[in-house]
UniProtKB/Swiss-Prot annotation:
Family indicated by similarity: Belongs to the universal ribosomal protein uS13 family.
Species for this entry: Pediococcus pentosaceus (strain ATCC 25745 / CCUG 21536 / LMG 10740 / 183-1w)
Protein name (Swiss-Prot/TrEMBL): Small ribosomal subunit protein uS13
Gene3D superfamilies for the chain: 1.10.8.50, 30s ribosomal protein s13, domain 2
Region of interest called Disordered, as start-end residue ranges on this chain: 89-121
InterPro entries to which the protein is assigned, alphabetical: Rbsml_uS13_C, Ribosomal_uS13, Ribosomal_uS13-like_H2TH, Ribosomal_uS13_bac-type, Ribosomal_uS13_CS
Keyword Flavoprotein: no
Purpose: Located at the top of the head of the 30S subunit, it contacts several helices of the 16S rRNA. In the 70S ribosome it contacts the 23S rRNA (bridge B1a) and protein L5 of the 50S subunit (bridge B1b), connecting the 2 subunits; these bridges are implicated in subunit movement. Contacts the tRNAs in the A and P-sites.
GO biological process, one term: translation
PANTHER family: 30S RIBOSOMAL PROTEIN S13/40S RIBOSOMAL PROTEIN S18, SMALL RIBOSOMAL SUBUNIT PROTEIN US13M
Domain of life per record: Bacteria
Entry's Gene Ontology cellular component terms: cytosol; small ribosomal subunit
Length: 121
């Protein structure tokens, strides 16, 4: 099993798909990495040579992935909250950040409905 950026890639998948298991690498980035490393997208992870793995590792090191990317994102959110911006307030309250309406939807961000218990008529 190839280990790149601290992630074990599944052996049976094509390398272009296997790279997307790394947080921060999507399909387009995976294709770009393989093109720069001069490795075919159709090779299975189990068929990679050590030289090809090293080339891919060197290319992935040029990108912000896994723990570093997670840390950067969380620090950005924390910064928005500290400066008191509108987006920071929305993050703090657990509401949608990008201008969506919340009258009816936004259940994913707001969580389960909380019924008003014990309310008499």
């Amino acid at each position: 099993m190839a280990r790149i950026a601290g992630v074990d890639l599944p052996r049976d998948k094509r390398i272009v798909i296997g790279l997307t298991y790394i947080f921060g690498i999507g399909n387009t980035t995976a294709q770009k990495i393989l093109k720069d490393a001069e490795v075919s997208e159709d090779i299975r992870v189990r068929d990679l040579t050590a030289d090809q793995e090293d080339k891919i590792r060197a290319e992935v090191d040029n990108y912000l992935v896994e723990g570093d990317l997670r840390r950067t994102v969380s620090l950005n959110i924390k910064r928005l909250q500290e400066i008191g911006s509108y987006r920071g307030m929305r993050h703090r309250r657990g509401l949608p950040v990008r201008g969506q309406h919340t009258k009816n939807n936004a259940r994913t961000r707001k969580g389960k409905k909380v019924s008003i218990a014990g309310r008499k008529k």
